[in-house]
Amino acid sequence: MIVLSNGVRIFINSNMNKDIYLGIASFGFENDIGEILGIAHLLEHILISFDSSKFVANASTARKYMSFWCCSIKGKSNYIDSINTLISWFFNNNKLRDNFCLNDIKNHIKELENEYYFRNEVFHCMDVLTFLENGDLYNGGRIDMLNNLESVNNMLYNRMHKIIGPNIVIFVKELNKNCLMLIQNSFGTLPSCPMSFSFPNFSNIDGKIIMMPSPFYTVMIKVSLSISNVISIMCLFETYHLIDYETVGNDLYVTLSFVKESDYENFINGVSTLKFNNVPNYTVLSLCDDFLMNAYLCFPWLSNDINNYLSTVRYSQNMFKNLEEDIQNSILLKKYIVVYPHFSKTVFNKNDSQMHKIVILDCLNEIKEDQLPKLNVNLMKKQTKNEIFIKYNDSSLIKYIIFAIGYKNNILRGNEGVSIHHQFSSEDIKSILESDTFLKYSKSKPAAMYQYLLLSFFVSGYSIEDILLNRESTIKLLKQYNNKILFGKKSRYDITTKSNFVCGIIKNKNINNNVITNTMWELKKKGLIYSMEHTKIDKRIFYIFMFTIYPDEVFLYLSKKFLSHCLIVSKTGNIEDFSSMKKDVIIKLC
């Protein structure tokens, strides 16, 4: 690790897929509390800008931090180009960017509203911890920010000037003289301390039960913020599923999720306890770069390589014993937060400023101090990398898709089905997918199904009526029978579903993945969409799908860009109506 004179920390991570990865601590949406919620997320969208034909890049805003990364595309750009591109997001002519075009701000606010819509159609993305801290359940920014553009612009300026050197963490794939000089002349010029300070007023959030949509019964237990506990949690994350951590303000929580309600109840009632007796004696942790960046930003006193702490702390069973006792003591004192699966839209006792509804209760269970646990919690151990292949006509398809999305597993779409890479045993996956809570959770967001239902409409010979009879699966893709797609006179189908989206097939003699990606970014810059999924159907034909609150505008843009198209425009309604979706099936007799 290299520390610049102003406190910027630089790590060499030759194993990551990114060229450069930058994080800014104390810069997430937790800092929006008391201001306009969504400023942090808006700033992230404004800052990142790149040529998608030369680079792959992304950014994200979390509760405590913001992160950005960039990677060159081989043959289109090089490593130093990536470094310069990421630097350009923050600096212009060696000066910190703090003046933003109002028209760009407007478009990005529209994009944020599309992201909110997308996330609420596909996920349950409510952050209860920030809500308990006096924020909202959703803190990513809404379209009503357009009503306060002058204030928003001032807050963006002030937020940029709160970036300081000690809060910057940079991972680079390699560190040569040129790369180091570029970083020193940009992020190395940031001040060591901010010009102004703000201290968010956090509420006491312990001893609460939150009832909300969730696939698991989750308990977040407050533990001491010590180097020993942090390294212990990292070792546990490397070893087991359903164990992670959260940081709220200056507090550290271990999160433990249960598939069965009885296991959860035994734990919070002191009948069972955690025993970490089977954690391997790690000398190196193979944590992904996202997890490492999260750790360095949440725990700024981690000033060395994570793996160095394994020997410095001299992690042992005694280290885990201390964490076990810390957890058990917090359970006894109700220093924890519970997320209890709850799917009713009509039962609630709290709402945030955006009128999102939720149930929050006080923990009332009592554990006697002399009560000794009789059982050990069964933990799901991580396996070596496994792969599942699910055919499109499998009735379990949607469950597996939601499972994969929830765990951020890679989903690879093929002609006949999807491949999902994971680290679960077959028994553990079965127990999760067959649990009542996961079944309710997977059915609580039906919008994810539309993408696959309508894909099958275009590539199979089946009618929409046949396809709708098989909602739990999709009709098997019939590409192996060499179906040929002909573009007829009708290029638009208007339907009514539970969601706003545009999908369909587009054709162009020069179409490829790059053209599709560029199209997505053009639509994003206009504030018309947040994300676009695509599947290659033939050499010159792609299927695309995107949620949007501006379906007519998206259709107009796509119909002008791709002359050969057949698109479905869905608008929200109480009763689904697919009656306009008629197609001709031509059978060629040989």
From Swiss-Prot:
Kindly state what the record says about how the cofactor is bound. Answer: Binds 1 zinc ion.
Q: Which UniProt keywords apply?
A: Hydrolase, Metal-binding, Metalloprotease, Protease, Zinc
GO molecular-function terms, A-Z:
metalloendopeptidase activity; zinc ion binding
Q: Which InterPro entries match?
A: Metalloenz_LuxS/M16, Peptidase_M44
Catalytic residues at: E44
One GO biological process term: viral life cycle
Source organism's superkingdom?
Answer: Viruses
Look up the record and name the cofactor or cofactors this protein needs.
Zn(2+)
Q: Which residues bind Zn(2+)?
A: H41, H45
Q: What is this protein called?
A: Probable metalloendopeptidase G1-type
- Which organism's genome codes for this protein? Yaba-like disease virus (YLDV)
